[in-house]
Amino acid sequence: MAALGNVLILAREELIAALLGLMVELRGLQPMFLKREESVTEALTRLAFDAVVIDCDHPDCTGDLLDTIRSAGAVPILFSPSRMQAEVREVAVRHGIRSFTLPTDPDTFGRMLEA
Protein backbone atom coordinates (compact mmCIF):
# COMPACT_ATOMS: atom_id res chain seq x y z
CA MET A 1 0.00 0.00 0.00
CA ALA A 2 1.20 3.48 -0.80
CA ALA A 3 1.27 6.16 1.87
CA LEU A 4 -0.55 9.46 1.46
CA GLY A 5 1.29 12.82 1.07
CA ASN A 6 -0.22 16.08 2.38
CA VAL A 7 -2.59 15.60 5.30
CA LEU A 8 -4.89 18.43 6.42
CA ILE A 9 -5.69 18.26 10.12
CA LEU A 10 -8.94 19.81 11.39
CA ALA A 11 -9.12 19.59 15.17
CA ARG A 12 -11.06 21.73 17.61
CA GLU A 13 -8.10 21.96 19.98
CA GLU A 14 -4.60 23.13 19.03
CA LEU A 15 -2.94 20.58 21.31
CA ILE A 16 -4.78 17.71 19.59
CA ALA A 17 -3.89 19.15 16.17
CA ALA A 18 -0.22 19.32 17.18
CA LEU A 19 -0.25 15.73 18.45
CA LEU A 20 -1.82 14.48 15.23
CA GLY A 21 0.67 16.57 13.24
CA LEU A 22 3.56 14.82 14.98
CA MET A 23 2.00 11.43 14.28
CA VAL A 24 1.59 12.37 10.60
CA GLU A 25 5.27 13.39 10.47
CA LEU A 26 6.29 10.07 12.06
CA ARG A 27 4.78 8.40 8.99
CA GLY A 28 6.92 10.55 6.69
CA LEU A 29 3.94 12.65 5.59
CA GLN A 30 3.37 16.40 5.59
CA PRO A 31 0.85 17.70 8.16
CA MET A 32 -0.99 20.85 7.11
CA PHE A 33 -3.30 23.17 9.03
CA LEU A 34 -5.75 25.90 8.10
CA LYS A 35 -4.28 29.37 7.80
CA ARG A 36 -5.78 32.10 9.96
CA GLU A 37 -9.25 33.05 8.74
CA GLU A 38 -9.12 30.30 6.08
CA SER A 39 -12.11 28.04 5.51
CA VAL A 40 -11.78 24.33 4.87
CA THR A 41 -13.08 24.82 1.33
CA GLU A 42 -10.45 27.51 0.68
CA ALA A 43 -7.71 25.19 1.95
CA LEU A 44 -8.95 22.40 -0.32
CA THR A 45 -8.59 24.70 -3.33
CA ARG A 46 -5.23 26.13 -2.17
CA LEU A 47 -3.41 22.80 -1.93
CA ALA A 48 -3.88 19.21 -2.97
CA PHE A 49 -4.45 16.99 0.06
CA ASP A 50 -4.38 13.24 0.06
CA ALA A 51 -6.25 13.02 3.36
CA VAL A 52 -8.20 15.27 5.71
CA VAL A 53 -8.28 14.17 9.35
CA ILE A 54 -11.33 15.87 10.88
CA ASP A 55 -12.68 15.97 14.43
CA CYS A 56 -16.29 14.77 14.33
CA ASP A 57 -17.17 17.68 16.66
CA HIS A 58 -15.41 20.30 14.52
CA PRO A 59 -17.95 23.03 13.67
CA ASP A 60 -17.38 22.48 9.94
CA CYS A 61 -17.78 18.68 10.07
CA THR A 62 -20.89 17.98 8.01
CA GLY A 63 -21.90 15.47 5.39
CA ASP A 64 -21.56 18.21 2.78
CA LEU A 65 -17.97 18.90 3.85
CA LEU A 66 -17.12 15.20 3.71
CA ASP A 67 -18.48 15.16 0.14
CA THR A 68 -16.43 18.28 -0.69
CA ILE A 69 -13.29 16.61 0.68
CA ARG A 70 -13.92 13.58 -1.54
CA SER A 71 -14.65 15.80 -4.55
CA ALA A 72 -11.27 17.47 -3.99
CA GLY A 73 -9.63 14.05 -4.30
CA ALA A 74 -8.80 13.64 -0.60
CA VAL A 75 -9.69 10.83 1.79
CA PRO A 76 -11.76 12.04 4.78
CA ILE A 77 -10.78 10.41 8.09
CA LEU A 78 -13.05 11.06 11.07
CA PHE A 79 -11.72 11.11 14.62
CA SER A 80 -12.69 12.11 18.14
CA PRO A 81 -10.66 12.78 21.28
CA SER A 82 -13.74 12.52 23.50
CA ARG A 83 -16.39 10.23 22.01
CA MET A 84 -16.63 6.46 22.27
CA GLN A 85 -15.14 4.43 19.42
CA ALA A 86 -18.49 2.80 18.55
CA GLU A 87 -20.14 6.21 18.27
CA VAL A 88 -17.49 7.57 15.90
CA ARG A 89 -17.42 4.36 13.87
CA GLU A 90 -21.21 4.51 13.42
CA VAL A 91 -20.98 7.99 11.89
CA ALA A 92 -18.00 6.98 9.75
CA VAL A 93 -19.77 3.88 8.41
CA ARG A 94 -22.83 5.98 7.57
CA HIS A 95 -20.59 8.20 5.40
CA GLY A 96 -18.36 5.40 4.10
CA ILE A 97 -15.17 6.80 5.62
CA ARG A 98 -12.38 5.73 7.99
CA SER A 99 -12.34 6.60 11.68
CA PHE A 100 -10.39 6.35 14.92
CA THR A 101 -10.55 7.68 18.45
CA LEU A 102 -7.91 9.10 20.75
CA PRO A 103 -5.88 7.89 22.39
CA THR A 104 -4.43 5.80 19.59
CA ASP A 105 -1.00 4.40 18.90
CA PRO A 106 1.18 5.50 15.96
CA ASP A 107 0.76 2.18 14.11
CA THR A 108 -3.05 2.26 14.27
CA PHE A 109 -3.03 5.89 13.18
CA GLY A 110 -0.59 5.07 10.39
CA ARG A 111 -2.91 2.39 9.02
CA MET A 112 -5.61 5.06 8.69
CA LEU A 113 -3.27 6.98 6.38
CA GLU A 114 -2.50 4.07 4.08
CA ALA A 115 -4.03 4.29 0.64
Model-derived features: where do they sit?
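Conserved phosphotransfer microenvironments
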Residues: 17, 50-72, 81-88
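Alpha-helical interaction/dimerization surfaces of two-component signaling modules
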Residues: 22-24, 43, 91
